[in-house]
C-alpha cells in the first residue's frame, strides 16, 4: 500500500517496476520528494497531490489533468507532453519549455509567458486567455477554437495546423505561414492577408470572406462551400481538392491549377477556361457547364451525373 508522502526510494522502486513511468493517477499520494527525476511519464491525473516539488524533471509526459495543483515550479522541465486540462493551474512559470504538446483547455490560466516554448501542439480551447505573446513558436498545431483570443501576435510561427474556428479573431497577419491546415470556419475574419501560405488545407466555410489574395498558396485542399467567395484569383494553384460547391463563383480564372478534384456542383459557372489543369476528377453535377474544351488537362474523369 502506498504512503501518502513518497520518498525518492519509493518513487525509484515504482519506476523500476513500470519501465521508468510513475503512475499515481487517482491515488491518495499527497506529495512527491524534492529533486525527483522521472525517466518516463509521470501520471498524476485525478490524484490528491496539491503541489509539485522543486527540481522536478520529467523526461516523458506529465499529466496533471483534474488535479488541485495551482502552480508549477519555476525549474520544471518536461521532455514530452504537459496536460493541464481541467486542472486548477492558475499561471505558467517563466522559461517553461515543453518538448511535446501543451494542453491548457478548461483551465483558469489567463496569460502565457513571453518565453514559452512548445515543441508539439498548443491547445487553448475553452480558456480565459485573451492574448498571445509576440514571436510565439508552436512546433505543431495551435488550437484556439472557442477561445477568447481576438488577435494573433506578431511573429507567430506555427509548424502544423492553426485552428481559429468560431473565434473572435477578425484579421490575420500579412505573410502568415502555416505549415499544416488553416481552419477558419465560423470565424470573424473577413479578409485574407497578402502572402498567406498554407501547407495543408484551407477552410473558409461559413465565413464572410468574399475574395482570395492574388498570391495565395494552398498546398492541399481548399474548402469554399458555404462561403461568400465570389471570385478566384488568376493563376490560383491548389495542391489538392478545390471545393466550390454551392458558392457564388460564376467564372473560373485563367491559369487555374487543381491537383485533386475540382468540384463545381451547384455553382453558376458556365464555361471552362482552355488552360485549366486538373489532377483528378471534374465534378459537374447540378452545374451550368455544358461543354468542356477537348484540350483541357484532366487527370481523372468528367462526371456529369
Language model region names:
Residues 22-28, 38-49, 58-69, 78-89, ...:
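Concave beta-strand-loop units of leucine-rich repeat
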Residues 1-12, 17, 51, 145, ...:
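Charge-rich, low-hydrophobicity low-complexity segments
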Residues 35-36, 53-56, 75-76, 96, ...:
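Hydrophobic anchor residues at the C-terminal helix/turn of individual leucine-rich repeat
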Residues 290-296:
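Short linear motifs in low-complexity, proline-biased tails and propeptides
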Residues 1-31, 296-305:
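N-terminal capping/linker segments that flank leucine-rich repeat
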Amino acid at each position: 500500500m502506498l504512503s501518502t508522502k513518497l520518498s525518492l526510494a519509493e518513487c525509484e522502486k515504482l519506476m523500476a517496476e513500470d519501465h521508468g513511468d510513475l503512475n499515481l493517477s487517482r491515488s491518495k499520494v499527497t506529495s512527491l520528494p524534492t529533486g525527483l527525476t522521472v525517466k518516463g511519464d509521470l501520471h498524476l491525473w485525478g490524484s490528491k497531490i496539491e503541489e509539485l516539488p522543486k527540481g522536478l524533471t520529467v523526461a516523458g509526459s506529465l499529466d496533471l489533468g483534474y488535479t488541485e495543483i495551482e502552480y508549477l515550479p519555476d525549474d520544471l522541465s518536461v521532455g514530452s507532453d504537459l496536460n493541464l486540462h481541467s486542472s486548477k493551474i492558475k499561471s505558467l512559470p517563466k522559461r517553461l519549455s515543453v518538448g511535446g504538446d501543451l494542453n491548457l483547455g478548461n483551465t483558469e490560466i489567463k496569460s502565457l509567458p513571453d518565453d514559452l516554448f512548445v515543441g508539439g501542439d498548443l491547445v487553448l480551447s475553452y480558456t480565459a486567455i485573451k492574448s498571445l505573446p509576440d514571436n510565439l513558436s508552436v512546433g505543431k498545431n495551435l488550437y484556439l477554437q472557442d477561445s477568447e483570443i481576438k488577435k494573433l501576435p506578431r511573429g507567430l510561427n506555427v509548424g502544423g495546423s492553426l485552428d481559429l474556428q468560431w473565434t473572435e479573431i477578425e484579421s490575420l497577419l500579412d505573410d502568415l505561414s502555416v505549415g499544416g491546415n488553416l481552419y477558419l470556419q465560423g470565424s470573424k475574419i473577413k479578409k485574407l492577408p497578402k502572402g498567406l501560405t498554407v501547407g495543408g488545407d484551407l477552410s473558409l466555410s461559413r465565413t464572410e470572406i468574399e475574395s482570395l489574395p492574388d498570391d495565395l498558396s494552398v498546398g492541399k485542399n481548399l474548402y469554399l462551400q458555404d462561403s461568400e467567395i465570389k471570385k478566384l484569383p488568376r493563376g490560383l494553384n491548389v495542391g489538392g481538392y478545390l471545393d466550390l460547391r454551392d458558392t457564388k463563383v460564376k467564372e473560373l480564372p485563367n491559369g487555374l491549377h487543381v491537383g485533386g478534384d475540382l468540384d463545381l456542383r451547384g455553382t453558376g459557372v458556365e464555361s471552362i477556361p482552355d488552360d485549366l489543369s486538373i489532377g483528378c476528377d471534374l465534378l459537374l453535377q447540378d452545374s451550368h457547364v455544358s461543354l468542356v474544351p477537348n484540350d483541357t488537362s484532366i487527370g481523372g474523369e468528367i462526371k456529369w451525373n
